[in-house]
Amino acid sequence: MGPGLLCWALLCLLGAGSVETGVTQSPTHLIKTRGQQVTLRCSSQSGHNTVSWYQQALGQGPQFIFQYYREEENGRGNFPPRFSGLQFPNYSSELNVNALELDDSALYLCASSL
């Protein structure tokens, strides 16, 4: 992979057993170049009104980006303003990253809860 390419991957967190839990993320993976913008989407289970986003760089643990509760930002990690988000009335969510940098190459995770 060339130095100007960013490899983005997403992980869908699914529950086990007969209880429907989890989220659906899209797209499942992306390849972008430095300076571009990306939007990642997360749809949570019906009734889950809290959505959290995390970034996990290779060889590291997940880092908290931000959390939304009922369409309002409810907490934010140590990420620059070019990382922004939204939560919609149906409690689905978006993570937007502007002016991509090489260090943004990571696994992006979303989680939902009541």
From Swiss-Prot:
Keyword Cell membrane: yes
PROSITE patterns tied to this protein: IG_LIKE (PS50835)
Domain Ig-like: 22-114
Gene Ontology cellular-component annotations: plasma membrane; T cell receptor complex
Localization, UniProt: Cell membrane
Record bears the keyword Disulfide bond: yes
Subunit note: Alpha-beta TR is a heterodimer composed of an alpha and beta chain; disulfide-linked. The alpha-beta TR is associated with the transmembrane signaling CD3 coreceptor proteins to form the TR-CD3 (TcR or TCR). The assembly of alpha-beta TR heterodimers with CD3 occurs in the endoplasmic reticulum where a single alpha-beta TR heterodimer associates with one CD3D-CD3E heterodimer, one CD3G-CD3E heterodimer and one CD247 homodimer forming a stable octameric structure. CD3D-CD3E and CD3G-CD3E heterodimers preferentially associate with TR alpha and TR beta chains, respectively.
Protein name (record): T cell receptor beta variable 5-4
Organism: Homo sapiens
Top-level taxonomy: Eukaryota, Metazoa, Chordata, Craniata, Vertebrata
